[in-house]
Amino acid sequence: MLYKSGEKRKGLLMSGCLYRIYGVGFSLGFFIALQIICGVCLAWLFFSCFICSNWYFVLFLWDFDLGFVIRSVHICFTSLLYLLLYIHIFKSITLIILFDTHILVWFIGFILFVFIIIIAFIGYVLPCTMMSYWGLTVFSNIIATVPILGIWLCYWIWGSEFINDFTLLKLHVLHVLLPFILLIILILHLFCLHYFMSSDAFCDRFAFYCERLSFCMWFYLRDMFLAFSILLCMMYVIFINWYFVFHEESWVIVDTLKTSDKILPEWFFLYLFGFLKAIPDKFMGLFLMVILLFSLFLFILNCILWFVYCRSSLLWLTYSLILFYSIWMSGFLALYVVLAYPIWMELQYWVLLLFLLIVCRLD
């Protein structure tokens, strides 16, 4: 059925030619649900013991049916979730630049992104290996540099004057509780998306008559096809090469009397870890890391406000896309490349300074 572009629409009506990349959001929700299910199975048998928490995962592989599958899914899907999440964010940024997207949908999505970062970091710490122990020690000491509340937050996280069993127990409770709060925020994100409608290609902007279809089973099947195709590709990683996402140092048993040679974060934390590593001052590194996260939201807010006044300006659309993909994205990827290869570590200060100047200029 055809509707005029300014006509009031009844129910949830979508464009008949949505791109495949729109299905990434559905895949994210699908894999988040699988992560929560596998996480609940792991949480039932978790030992909040400072010494035995790493051996628990080995025991889970040996003594429980399909234990290796549950553990591999929970580990490998974390990297997959972040890969899909970054694709979803960059797709949303492109659509916000090109089309009018409501700010509330983006704001709730930004809160989801922050929650996922917190949940993933707590999950990284819970096995309590040499790497995660010293990673938590360094990060909590950085939090202690925050004025007024820093010392109190550090002691609250530790539960004592040092990291012990109570720390793992507290982090385990947070790691179980926060995903359910994440589900509530995710439902709000979907509600706002359905209420304000999605930015669907060129129909809302350039076409006077655009074909609108009811959100029927066809859209579900197409999204499910993408999700199950990704799941099929992940079967190889889960059953054969699941240690591909692991560092060798992640298997080293924790020893509080020995300092780890290096701290290697997961690849999806690499750009955040770069700020803490490149800035000598702890508080300034933490401050710039927070500014980086909020600069993404401020950049989109800037684009939306400009869009209100430059709605019909093709020059502004071209300028925004070139600005984002050639400068913002190049700085983001440069941080990854420089921090991933130690041979280029001497360049990290210059790349970090250039990226911060660009972000401040865009905002």
Curated annotation (Swiss-Prot):
| Family per similarity comment | Belongs to the cytochrome b family.
Tell me what gene encodes this: MT-CYB
PROSITE patterns named among the record's database cross-references:
CYTB_CTER (PS51003), CYTB_NTER (PS51002)
Q: Which residues are listed for heme b b562 binding in this entry? A: 74, 175
Cofactor, how bound (note): Binds 2 heme b groups non-covalently.
GO cellular component term, pick one: mitochondrial inner membrane
An example of a Pfam family matching this protein is: Cytochrom_B_C
The cofactors it requires, by name, are: heme b
Q: What is this protein called?
A: Cytochrome b
Q: Which GO terms describe its molecular function?
A: metal ion binding; ubiquinol-cytochrome-c reductase activity
Q: Does the keyword Transmembrane helix apply?
A: yes
- The record lists heme b b566 as bound by 88, 189
> What InterPro entries does this protein map onto?
Cyt_b/b6_C (IPR005798), Cyt_b/b6_C_sf (IPR036150), Cyt_b/b6_N (IPR005797), Cytb/b6-like_sf (IPR027387), Cytochrome_b_C_euk/bac (IPR048260), Di-haem_cyt_TM (IPR016174)
Signal sequence range = none
Primary subcellular site in the record, as a coarse category: mitochondrion
Membrane topology is: Multi-pass membrane protein
| Membrane-spanning intervals of the chain | 24-44, 68-90, 105-125, 171-191, 219-239, 287-307, 321-341, 342-362
- UniProt keyword list: Electron transport, Heme, Iron, Membrane, Metal-binding, Mitochondrion, Mitochondrion inner membrane, Respiratory chain, Transmembrane, Transmembrane helix, Transport, Ubiquinone
Query: Which GO BP terms sit in this record?
Result: mitochondrial electron transport, ubiquinol to cytochrome c
Task: Tell whether Heme is among the UniProt keywords.
Answer: yes
